[in-house]
Amino acid sequence: MKLTVKCFATLMPLTPPGGSLEFHGTDICDLLRQLSIPESEARIIFVNGIGVEKDALLHDGARVGIFPPVGGG
């Protein structure tokens, strides 16, 4: 299936070229493995603009945003 993926902040270099990815898994955990992103480094994940857990299933055409842990203060 084809996904649009955008990684943010420190994960930005792991965004697929052009943001498009041919995905061969079923869920967010599979996607993180395919992108070589450790699960601990993907703290906030959106699919089609909705926050999801790492066990969320993905479907063809989904737009995925992956954010690392953030801090501030």
Task: Label each PLM-derived region with a short phrase.
Residues 1-72:
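Ubiquitin-like/PB1-type beta-grasp interaction modules and other compact soluble beta-rich domains
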